[in-house]
Regions:
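Coil-to-alpha-helix initiation sites in intrinsically disordered, low-complexity, charged segments
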Residues: 2-5, 68, 88-93, 197, ...
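Extracellular/lumenal inter-transmembrane loop segments of multi-pass membrane transporters
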Residues: 7, 100-107, 139-144
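Membrane-interfacial loop-to-helix junctions in multi-pass transporters
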Residues: 12-15, 105-109, 147-148, 199-203
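Interfacial helix-loop-helix linkers and transmembrane-helix boundary segments
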Residues: 9-12, 72-75, 133, 169-172
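Membrane-interface coil-to-helix junctions
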Residues: 25-126, 173
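Membrane-embedded helix bundles of polyisoprenyl
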Residues: 24-27, 118-196, 200-241
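Start-transfer (signal-anchor) and selected internal transmembrane alpha helices
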Residues: 1-42, 51, 147-151
């Protein structure tokens, strides 16, 4: 009886503990391959079998060493080189910032190792963002139903096989960061859409715009945000859910 009373009083705490466990399971699965990412010939770390991450790593190493990215990359599109202003550079900067944090805490001795851990760390934040988004979708339900649905959805999200290759350790791809910004954009949009006070709608709308802009600095797939939000607003207008 005491246990039941405790659970009733601490329902929110129980939900967040379950969420933490779900995220832990997801991150654990995504770090099982780390021991395989060490080059047995040199004893140094290397990224997984993907092409783009090596470019992002090289740029991140340059940023860590020099403070900012070069304007012209002579190693890309040889012999003409490549104007880095034409590429989405935020990912490499985020890897560099992540390395600076880990190295300060003595948790990483190389940019490569930090890049290996980076997609897993971003996945944890993405899972949290997805939980908030899923919970907000069912904002009209009571708290128990909202949290339960969001937890089940998050569990399926962290275990879905198609997401694993883009969020696993050693593959610092654009999607590992972009998904976080995407779900936060959706979450803030729903907050703005459902808020009863104009000032809060404005604040959340601005935050949704910022998240969308940050996603655009990482991944061209930000167009999904435009399509999703515009379609949702159009359908709501047709169903007379929006007062004009």
């Amino acid at each position: 009886k005491k246990l039941i009373d405790f659970i009733k009083r601490k329902k929110d705490l129980i939900f967040y503990l379950i969420l933490a466990f779900i995220i832990f399971i997801g991150t654990y699965i995504r770090t099982l391959n780390i021991s395989k990412l060490k080059d047995i010939t040199t004893g140094t770390w290397t990224l997984g079998p993907d092409l783009d991450p090596f470019l992002f790593l090289r740029w991140a190493e340059y940023i860590v060493k020099n403070g900012s990215l070069m304007a012209h990359d002579a190693m890309r599109n040889v012999p003409l080189g490549f104007d880095t202003a034409g590429e989405m550079k935020l990912l490499s900067y985020m890897i560099a910032w992540f390395h600076n944090i880990l190295s300060t805490l003595s948790l990483s001795d190389s940019v490569t190792y930090s890049a290996i851990l980076f997609p897993v760390a971003m996945f944890a934040f993405t899972a949290l963002a997805f939980f908030l988004f899923a919970k907000k979708v069912f904002y009209k339900e009571n708290k128990l139903i909202r949290n339960s649905i969001a937890l089940i959805a998050t569990l399926l999200f962290v275990l879905v096989p198609s997401l694993l290759p883009r969020t696993i350790a050693g593959i610092p791809e654009k999607e590992s960061v972009a998904f976080f910004f995407m779900f936060m954009a959706f979450y803030f949009f729903l907050e703005a859409f459902t808020s009863e006070k104009f000032k809060f709608s404005l604040i959340y709308g601005v935050l949704a715009g910022i998240m969308t802009g940050l996603m655009a600095l990482v991944w061209g797939g930000m167009i999904f945000v435009f399509f999703t939000i515009s379609s949702a607003v159009l359908i709501s207008f047709i169903l007379e859910k929006i007062k004009v």
